[in-house]
């Protein structure tokens, strides 16, 4: 099902993102994983190549907060592979900071990584997917987007925004 599909997976160096990268590779996809730092991307790539040297996997570390850097990296991927079939927005940051210890900067940092970064990846990718006649965008969310959590208010708020983004994109792009 994923044979020869080209996928970008953000937050692909550890946890859910790394497991997603592995599953896509096991099913024949060509994967470009995004991570926050060169060292973590290179470490993940080395581990994946050690497990299966035949897997088609590469990595990049654009600042997901920078829409231009993200767009440039996504365009490079399109130029390399000729298409982008799947975007998995998995990069994110959890939080358990009590509200009385919050700052506006802390709240914005979480919203930026969990919501704005996804949009920064979606915008250039949607254009490519429309040009090629389709694609798939997956956004990682959390149950706390529905039920909240006892502290770290920005995390459930950000994941609620991701849900709204996902539902809106499905309604806008799904019919096409």
Regions found by a protein language model. Name each.
Residues 127, 171-175:
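Alpha-helical segment proximal to the catalytic Tyr-Lys
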Residues 142:
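Residue(s) in the substrate-gating loop at a strand-loop-helix junction
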């Amino acid at each position: 099902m994923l044979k020869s599909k080209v996928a970008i997976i953000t937050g692909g160096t550890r946890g859910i993102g790394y497991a997603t990268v592995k599953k896509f590779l096991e099913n024949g996809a060509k994967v470009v994983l995004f991570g926050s730092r060169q060292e973590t991307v290179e470490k993940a790539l080395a581990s994946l190549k050690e497990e299966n040297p035949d897997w088609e996997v590469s990595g990049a570390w654009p600042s997901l907060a920078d829409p231009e850097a993200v767009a440039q990296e996504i365009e490079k991927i399109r130029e390399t592979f000729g298409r982008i079939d799947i975007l998995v927005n998995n990069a994110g940051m959890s939080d358990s900071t009590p509200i009385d210890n919050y700052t506006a900067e802390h709240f914005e940092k979480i919203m930026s990584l969990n919501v704005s970064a996804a949009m920064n990846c979606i915008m250039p990718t949607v254009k490519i997917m429309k040009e090629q006649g389709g694609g798939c965008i997956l956004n990682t969310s959390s149950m706390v987007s529905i039920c909240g959590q006892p502290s770290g208010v920005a995390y459930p708020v950000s994941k609620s925004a991701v849900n709204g983004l996902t539902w809106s994109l499905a309604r806008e792009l799904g019919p096409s």
